[in-house]
Amino acid sequence: MALRKILTQGDPALEKVCRPVEKFNKRLHILLDDMRETLEESGGVGLAAPQVGILRRVVVVLDAEENMLELVNPVIVRQEGEQDGFEGCLSVPGMYGRVQRPSFVTVRAQDREGNFFEASGEEMVARCFCHELEHLDGHLFVEHTDQLYTAEELDEIMAEGEK
């Protein structure tokens, strides 16, 4: 396994639509292993293949129990409700924005062997599914927010909300 460099906003790879995975082979397994390690090292909750320069429909995310889910060729098959909250992105380091997302999401995907499965999540996991799948179509969360905040500004906003 190896750490991969995470691309940042402005890199053209982050604006491209990713191709589906067709071969479930050792190269895919290496990519998934590297993405897992890169996500663990970064401290994030999700990572999409284009963020490491690979234009394939592959995502790794942490679920509510902090288990790592590998999603190959994922699609959202169900979404319900609405939530409004802050999110950030490893490709937009140090910046956060308020984004509307569904409060519950089910995705259908394939595992590293090509077997189909469904995974569901609510609140933060639903947010993460939506956020990461948008990367596969060349989009960043900043397209959904009117204003970006630094970590310090976000801390102040959150502290005000607790009063």
Describe the function of each predicted region.
Residues 1-163:
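Positively charged
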